[in-house]
Amino acid sequence: MNAITILVVHHSPTPTARGIADTVLTAARDAAAEVAESMGDASQVRIVERAALEPDVEELLAADAVILGTTANFGYISGALKHYFDSTFAAAHEPTAGLPVSWWIRGGYDTTGAEKAMRSLTTGMNWEIAAEPVEFVGDPSEHADQLVTMAQTVVGAAVMASEKEK
């Protein structure tokens, strides 16, 4: 199997948001380790973390799947994640069509506008939802299992897609 890259792009400006990102990153890394153990190669799945304010088009073009994370701010995704899309769209929307994606959105009061925006942006990129997005308000610990499942499912989708390409 060729190396598979899962790109985790997020904006996590608070300890609460950082904790959500850490939960997702740990789950993705654990899933990658399980793949390595079952398939015998520790370098098969790489988890790459990217701050949304520091977009890297080449990194996105090399990704086999993407997990996005943001807070819901004033009814929209974070400006940082919008900046990521603005900075990568022109170069990446055609070459990454069909890319498996999922995301988390955590709001203090409401995530409705951010959910709509995320679906519009990922649809505009022609990405395919690989796992049920985790969109919630309140205490992240109440959604930890969903976050873990989402991350594991995205890793699994990327591995399955890679196996089909063989």
Segment roles from a protein language model:
Residues 1-3, 96-97:
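Short, flexible coil/linker segments at domain boundaries that flank nucleotide/cofactor-interacting
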Residues 31-41, 92-93, 161-165:
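Alpha-helix termini
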Residues 15-19, 76, 112-113, 142:
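Residues that form or flank phosphate/diphosphate-binding pockets in enzymes
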Residues 34-54:
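A short beta-strand-loop structural module common to alpha/beta enzyme folds
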Residues 14-15, 105-110, 136-141:
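Short histidine/acidic/glycine/proline-rich micro-motifs that form metal-
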Residues 52-128:
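Helix-loop-strand module that forms the ligand-binding subsite of alpha/beta enzymes
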Residues 2-32:
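N-terminal beta1-alpha1 ligand-phosphate binding loop
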Residues 39, 128-166:
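Glycine-rich phosphate/pyrophosphate-binding loop and the adjoining helix
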